[in-house]
Every structure is written in structure tokens, then in C-alpha cells.
Amino acid sequence: MPFQIKQNTLNLSVPIERLAGAYYRIQRTKQNISLSCLAKELRMNKGFLSDLENGKRHFPDGLCKQIDSILNTNFNTNYDLYILSRKYLFEIFENFFFERQQSILDIYKIIQESENNIINSYAYFTFKIVQLFYYLRIEKNNSKIIEIEALLNQNLNCLQSDEISIYYSLLGIFYKRDVASNHIALDYFLKSNMMCNSSSIVYSMNIFQLISVYAE
């Protein structure tokens, strides 16, 4: 059986309300705006806004535009951007597994044309993994990787299980670079394997990486 990445494209478990709410919560906190202040600006009950940010309620029509005007954001509600971001993520990891570097660079070249729209959409968290790979294998920026790790570890409920498996695998590769952090790498690889199918590329990548972890 050929290796494959199992994509949960037909039954995605993370609701879009959670993705939108978490996106706005992060943008609000980045600007040091309290929940109470934003609720006051929106003339909205603080508890209702909190529920929105935690994905417990649907966004009323026009509310995204209102919040955008206050936070100076531009959230794109086109769901296709989310699906596209997932597609990029899986293609990048597959090309990584088969060592097709030029194919990876070609994907990132395409991404640059729509990056601003993707990052300001339901794809925000998925795209952070795409960025993590870029900083891991192309630009090699450790501080950016740690920054993304902190963000995503606090918002794992905004990622699908197949996305988490790739995310953990990439972090395992990152921490495996230093023998002193091999125990962290081991933990991430094992957690990644728990999230993916044993016939998947992600699982195979983890097993390959674990051999060197155990050898050191």
C-alpha cells in the first residue's frame, strides 16, 4: 500500500465559529484591548462576546465587519481559503517526505500571492503550521518557530487531528536538532503518531526520525 496523508476533508470536526472566534480573540489581545472594552464598542453583552470568542455561538450577520472596523482587521469568511490552506499543508509535507525541495518552493511561491487573505480567514491556525515549516526548513528562524509553537499549543482545539499530527511531527524535527532537547522531540513524535494512521506519510516520517532519536 502506498503511503498517504489521511485528510479529514469530508467531516471536519472543528466548527468555523471556533476558528473565527479564536482569530478575533488573538487579534484583540495583540492590541491589548480588553474583552469589556471591545464589548462596549460593539454595544454587546460581555458574556455574549466571550461566547463568540470561544466558539460557542454563531456570529450574527454583519458582526465580523463591525469587529474588523474596531480592530483594523479584515477577516475573510470565504471557507475555500481554509480548504486551500489544508491542501497546501498536506502537499508541503508530502513533498518534504519525498525530498522534493523545488516542489515545496513552488508551493510557497504560489502562497505568497494570497497569503494575506489566507492568514486573515478561518485558515489562520492551519496556515500557522505552513509558516512553521517555512521557518523550519527554508528561512530557519528558531524564534518564529517557538512563537508559533506557543500560539498553537494554546489553541490546539482550532486544529483538525490530521493537522496536529503534522504540527507535532515538525516540532519533533525541530527539537531533534539538539541532543539536549531530544526528550522533547521524542514526546512530539510519539504524540504525532497517536494522531495519524500507521500507513500515513506522517507516521513513516516519525518512525524514521525516532530511529535517530533513540540512537543518540
Residue spans for each PLM region:
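Amphipathic alpha-helical segments of tetratricopeptide repeats
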Residues: 108-116, 149-157, 190-198
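Single-residue signature of alpha-solenoid repeat helices
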Residues: 104, 144-145, 185
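Tandem amphipathic alpha-helical repeat scaffolds
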Residues: 87-99, 126-140, 165-180, 205-216
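Alpha-solenoid helical repeat architecture
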Residues: 79-80, 119-125, 159-167, 198-209
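A short, Lys/Arg-rich alpha-helix, primarily the initiator
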Residues: 2-31
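Short alpha-helical DNA-recognition segment
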Residues: 31-51
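DNA major-groove recognition helix of helix-turn-helix/homeodomain DNA-binding modules
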Residues: 60-77
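Short C-terminal boundary/hinge segments that cap the last helix of small helical domains
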Residues: 10, 72-90
